[in-house]
């Protein structure tokens, strides 16, 4: 969990830049992460603020942008049937269990740009560093951008992670948004097959763990002057 104070600073300052032989300073990892967060924040349904709801045109544009970043980082990447953006960087042995990293890429109305993309984009940049250095780990690394956490459009939260956990309730496909469009129809318009959502579920043996870098949405770290904290329990 990253404190508000660290966000308010130039995030790039917290990650050192390197100085190549030619003397021209390379862009730091922090600068790259912040630049991509800004680029993703520009993909919005409203020009005055950030709104990117599940299965909208802007949501699809964001998914395509993230897919491109994953592939540039050396990952095989695809959309699953609920719209999660999934990338995999193989370990030393193909088919190894994975450590999963990521966050969500949908937003609430008038959202903050760090909520979700910080964890997702930082994870992609970490994998890109592994690729750049030619390193493979004893396990695979998977990065996932959950399609829906906020539940704004269909009044049902955590749809992306429910699909991965194997707890997605197919009755939700009949839920309708404010325009009367069902989730099933919205998925089809997005280019996905709602009949295959069950295939997004992951078996326990495939996953070593899940790590998500996230902004602090409270005052504790800021009040104590701490840049980061480790979450040991969560409600919900």
Sequence positions of predicted segments:
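Charged/polar low-complexity intrinsically disordered segments
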Residues: 7-10
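N-terminal capping segment at the start of a domain
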Residues: 17-56
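A non-catalytic alpha/beta surface segment that caps or lines the substrate-entry region
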Residues: 42-90
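Catalytic-core environment of secreted peptidases
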Residues: 73, 85-118
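Short coil/turn connectors at secondary-structure junctions
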Residues: 94-99, 136-141, 205-208
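Alpha-helical metal-binding/catalytic segments enriched in His/Glu/Asp
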Residues: 101, 111-149
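Midchain, well-structured core segments that form catalytic/ion-binding scaffolds
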Residues: 148-149, 153-236
């Amino acid at each position: 969990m990253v404190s508000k104070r660290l966000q308010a600073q130039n995030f790039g300052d917290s990650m050192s830049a390197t100085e190549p032989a030619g003397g021209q300073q390379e862009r730091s990892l922090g600068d790259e992460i912040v630049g991509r967060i800004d680029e993703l924040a520009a993909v919005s349904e409203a020009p005055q603020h950030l709104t990117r709801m599940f299965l909208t045109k802007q949501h699809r544009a964001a998914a395509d942008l993230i897919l491109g970043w994953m592939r540039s980082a050396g990952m095989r990447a695809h959309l699953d049937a609920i719209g999660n953006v999934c990338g995999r960087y193989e370990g030393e042995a193909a088919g190894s269990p994975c450590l999963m990293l990521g966050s969500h890429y949908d937003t609430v109305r008038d959202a903050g740009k760090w909520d979700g993309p910080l964890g997702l984009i930082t994870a992609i940049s970490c994998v890109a560093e592994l690729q750049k250095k030619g390193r493979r780990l004893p396990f695979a690394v998977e990065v996932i951008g959950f399609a829906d956490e906020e539940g704004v459009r269909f009044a049902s939260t955590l749809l992306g992670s429910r699909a991965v956990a194997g707890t997605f309730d197919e009755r939700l496909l009949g839920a309708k948004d404010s325009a009367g469009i069902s989730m099933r129809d919205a998925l089809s318009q997005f280019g996905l097959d709602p009949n295959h959502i069950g295939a997004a579920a992951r078996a326990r043996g495939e996953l070593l763990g899940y790590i998500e870098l996230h902004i602090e949405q409270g005052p504790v770290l800021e009040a104590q002057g701490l840049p980061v904290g480790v979450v040991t329990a969560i409600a919900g």
